């Protein structure tokens, strides 16, 4: 009988099976802080691998983009169709300080606006704010029936659409060029630009549901910690308070010992 390996006899491997390490044991949670122009400042939490050698945790967090519903930021369900993008700019302690990085409208809201018997008018323009942010703003609007109109449809002529589009661009440029990014975001929240476009174009053709549907940041200025702290307003890191020592507990004066 030939001598060989008996396959039926299983031998134990050296060292045994390695225990799988929990990947979360090497990670830390950080709080995401929204700018002070929003009511809710604590957006949520994010994970990052702890600092190991040359890999610094804070560097891995910078420039992360978080998408948050405006309803959560403003504690108002009326804003649930808006999505705000926030980008991580700096890390202080366990807090990630963010800044506005774009805006969008949910798909279901956009689909609900598009209907028959009306004209859809869109315009977009590139603008630069006073603090050197370059943005691309997209506007959308729909025609509506005039007062006492019997006709079922409310289609605008191509010449009227061109005029309305020109007016949309003009208003978006004037509104953005005269303020900084923080002030511009404060105009987006109550949809004041959309209402102004409705008023300005009413003489050409009455409009309804005029929205700044999307905002993209094309170019941002060089990072400045001072500007970021202005955006976050009253934010300050948790530090100890300096206490005054009572007069009777004054530190003893140092005495020099001669010959020591």
UniProtKB/Swiss-Prot annotation:
User: Which BP terms does GO give this entry?
Assistant: translation
The cellular location(s) given in this protein's UniProt record come to:
Cytoplasm
Official protein name in the record: Small ribosomal subunit protein eS1
Organism field: Helianthus annuus
Tell me, how does this one assemble?
Answer: Component of the small ribosomal subunit. Mature ribosomes consist of a small (40S) and a large (60S) subunit. The 40S subunit contains about 33 different proteins and 1 molecule of RNA (18S). The 60S subunit contains about 49 different proteins and 3 molecules of RNA (25S, 5.8S and 5S).
Q: What is the lineage of its organism?
A: Eukaryota, Viridiplantae, Streptophyta, Embryophyta, Tracheophyta
Region spans: Disordered: 1-22
Q: One Pfam family name from the record?
A: Ribosomal_S3Ae
Keywords carried by this UniProt record: Cytoplasm, Ribonucleoprotein, Ribosomal protein
């Amino acid at each position: 009988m030939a001598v060989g390996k008996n396959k039926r006899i299983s031998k134990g491997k050296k060292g045994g099976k390695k225990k799988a390490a929990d990947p979360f044991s090497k990670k830390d949670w950080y709080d995401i802080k929204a700018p002070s122009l929003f009511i809710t400042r604590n957006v949520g939490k994010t994970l990052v691998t702890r600092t190991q050698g040359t890999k610094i945790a804070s560097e891995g967090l910078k420039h992360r983009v978080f998408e948050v519903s405006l309803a959560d930021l403003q504690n108002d369900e009326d804003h649930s169709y808006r999505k705000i993008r926030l980008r991580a700019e700096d890390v202080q302690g366990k807090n990630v300080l963010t800044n506005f990085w774009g805006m969008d409208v949910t798909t279901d809201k956009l689909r609900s606006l598009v209907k028959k018997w009306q004209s859809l008018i869109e315009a977009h323009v590139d603008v630069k704010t006073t603090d050197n942010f370059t943005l691309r703003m997209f506007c959308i609007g729909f025609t509506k029936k005039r007062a006492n109109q019997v006709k079922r449809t409310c289609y605008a002529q191509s010449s009227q659409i061109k005029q309305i589009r020109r007016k949309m661009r003009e208003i978006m440029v004037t509104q953005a060029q005269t303020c900084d990014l923080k002030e511009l975001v404060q105009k987006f929240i109550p949809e004041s630009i959309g209402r102004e476009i409705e008023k300005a174009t009413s003489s050409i053709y009455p409009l309804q549901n005029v929205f700044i549907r999307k905002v993209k940041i094309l170019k941002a200025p060089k990072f400045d910690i001072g500007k970021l702290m202005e955006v976050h307003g009253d934010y300050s890191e948790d530090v100890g308070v300096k206490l005054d020592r009572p007069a009777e507990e004054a530190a003893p004066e140092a005495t020099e010992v001669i010959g020591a």
